[in-house]
Amino acid sequence: KEIVGLDECVIDVAVTFNRPDCNSVVGIAREAAVALERKFTPPETDFDTVDEISTRQYVNVDVRDAELCPAYFMQAAEVKIEPSPLWMRRRLHAAGLRGINNIVDVTNYVLLEVGQPMHAFDYKEISDKTIVVRRARKGETIIPLNEKEYELDENILVIADKSRPVGLAGVMGGLNSGIK
């Protein structure tokens, strides 16, 4: 274990359903700072790097339910799919996740660090190059990345393209739209 770098300490934390803010490294650090009466400094983020104009060249975003989704951020990029760096694969492995590729692994890493679920869409799989954030239609179905089929109703927020749901908003991306 020591030779391949799998000897780090892992803390397994059970979080109750009413504390989703603690489902990340940042959330646990914030809670620990409060408990230990220490100052918490959140990690810096830089959203100024998002280039909305370049994204619009590739994909249109149509948010149809601003009450359930007041903001939707997307970045389009041409990226070569390849293995993630070893340090990232090790951290994902320590958290019980297997490395898949650089794109999927980054979304999982962000989830672990800040608790924000994300899904990387395969551009070729998005019909009419439009992402629509809307409520599901009664009877619509989706097969997310866990490969189980779900029947949806109007109370569920989905990320869709022009023809079908491609993700369950904030939960899991669709198998039909993921990076392969």
What spans do the regions from the language model cover?
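Phosphate-rich ligand and nucleic-acid binding surfaces
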Residues: 1-180
